[in-house]
Structures are given as structure tokens and as C-alpha cells.
């Protein structure tokens, strides 16, 4: 069921900036987004970038010790969100980076919010071409343990996420 919600151009720009890893100067790399949240506009007609709900690569090691833990703390406990998380992980063979699309729909969110976010998910997913990993999360217990994301990324072959062993 489509909700009629549209995706703001800024959301698409953020996705494209996160997806394309072109050679960049150290300053440009620091400005790259590691994680970003998207929400519905106040009139519930557009999916927009949620201001101040992001982690930049340059924040890691400076104001952000562990990007995964910091990302989990950005999620509102009583409302839905969409998120992109640029996961850096290691398998037994190699280091990898993949974008993960997350649909955050906590049990404590209002039913109306869960319904409109669920029915609008396809609109944003269609704009995020090439996403390999999608994850619907319904509460902190599902997301706070990094090993759950490790399983989503590669089953039992992932040995570390963001430099931390699983």
C-alpha cells in the first residue's frame, strides 16, 4: 500500500554521497556521512533528512568513540525512522564496507506512525538503488548488540564491526 509520501531531493543526494566512494581529500572524507536518519516532514508528506541526526566519518575518534553505539543512541525510543548506516566490517577473508538501510519501528511508537512509515518504506527504498542489506528493527534489544548487524551483513563469517570483535 503506497502512502503518497514523496522523497525529498536532499535524501537522494545524501544517499548518493554515501554510496559513491570516489577518491577524496582527507577533508572531504571527514565530511562523509557514516550514519544518517530520515524522518517524515511535519505535514507527513515528505521523507526528509533529520537535521542533527547524523555521524560524520571525521567525528569518529574525536567526538564519537564507537560509531555503532553512537548510531543506536540517535534512534528515538518512541517513534519510527529510516536510516542509512555505512558499516565497516571484516570477514575471515577481507575488510568490507556496505550501506545498510534500516527501518526503525519500535514497539513503543504510535500505531499511526508505524503505519505511515511502513507504507512509505517502498518510496524511499526505490530511491536507494543498489542497497544490499535491509533491516527492520522493532526495539533496542534487536539493534544494541552489534553481532546482530554482523549476522545481517554476512551470516557467521563477519568477525568484527567498526573494528570491534563480534
From Swiss-Prot:
The modification Phosphoserine is found at residue 24. GO terms for biological process: actin filament fragmentation; actin filament severing. The phosphorylation of Ser-24 may prevent recognition of the nuclear localization signal. A motif (Nuclear localization signal) lies at residues 30-34. Keywords: Actin-binding, Cytoplasm, Cytoskeleton, Nucleus, Phosphoprotein. GO terms for molecular function: actin filament binding. GO terms for cellular component: actin cytoskeleton; cytoplasm; nuclear matrix; nucleus. SMART domains: ADF (SM00102). Its main location: nucleus. CDD domains: ADF_cofilin_like. Disulfide bonds: none annotated. Widely distributed in various tissues. Residues 4-153 form the ADF-H domain. Pfam families: Cofilin_ADF. It is found in: Nucleus matrix; Cytoplasm, Cytoskeleton. Controls reversibly actin polymerization and depolymerization in a pH-sensitive manner. It has the ability to bind G- and F-actin in a 1:1 ratio of cofilin to actin. It is the major component of intranuclear and cytoplasmic actin rods. PANTHER family: COFILIN-RELATED (PTHR11913). Belongs to the actin-binding proteins ADF family. This is Cofilin-2. The lineage of its organism: Eukaryota, Metazoa, Chordata, Craniata, Vertebrata.
